[in-house]
Curated annotation (Swiss-Prot):
This is ATP-dependent 6-phosphofructokinase. It is found in: Cytoplasm. Pathway: Carbohydrate degradation; glycolysis; D-glyceraldehyde 3-phosphate and glycerone phosphate from D-glucose: step 3/4. One of its GO terms (cellular component) is 6-phosphofructokinase complex.
Amino acid sequence: MIKKIGVLTSGGDAPGMNAAIRGVVRTALSERLEVFGIYDGYLGLYENRMVQLDRYSVSDMINRGGTFLGSARFASFYQDKIRSIAVQNIKKRKIDALVVIGGDGSYIGAQKLTEMGIPCISIPGTIDNDVSGTDYTIGYFTALQTVVEAIDRLRDTSSSHQRISIVEVMGRHCGDLTLAAAIAGGCEFIVLPEIDYKKEDLVIEIQAGIAKGKKHAIVAITEYICDVEELAQYIEKKTNRETRATILGHIQRGGAPVVYDRILASRMGAYSVELLIKGYQGKCVGIQNEKMVFNDIKNALKNMKRTFKKDWLITAKKLY
């Protein structure tokens, strides 16, 4: 029977992480459990930087972006000797289980700790929406709103100058954020990691649009596919249309979480504690068809590639 739990946020921050921490803390306290917050993710676990949390520790946190516990990327945590020190720190505090909020890298750490005797439940927190076992991740909808607002602003200036604008969106190997933002923002062209990309083909599509009378256009592209500044120069040379690239960058991770992210994070935080109380470990929570679900972290990591929303792309192309 667990009496104390710890909670940490790891990897890239995402709007709604504070709401998830709040969900964990308030639910645990309602079940008469003690809760410890761990600063800066697995790094704080290794350095033994923890603090006991009460209900007031998470007051006025549901609407705040980022994570008040801090986060860090700590590659050394993959080393057995580093994790052993972290486990010792957990045991010194008599913490019985952990809730880990983050992306796939955080999942790996949680699985390793579970295998070392520390029960863990993971919550998907990343704007990339690239974690399997869930329809949506915490932070995705807020980032989507941010990207669409940026596209709206770019369209204002692009239309004024009859310009082609390229907007680079986060997502790593997953195009969910780019695709959804492109549909909502009315982008004329979409470049995703899930589909074959050739700059020559993109130019042909753009030229076809110009031939139809298109005076300006927005190209939405997921990060890491190509150098967008070089792409802008190439498009401008081939089309004789002024072309500019905008990299949205880390602004996509900031800001107060939108309503859906607050609700999702609160539900996932509460559900993770409920699973620990029932004796589950090595699980990751998710939402599917608006219902809370859980899967083995190990299975989620084996099947990390999400199903590509091909039907969304087909719809988007019809709307050009």
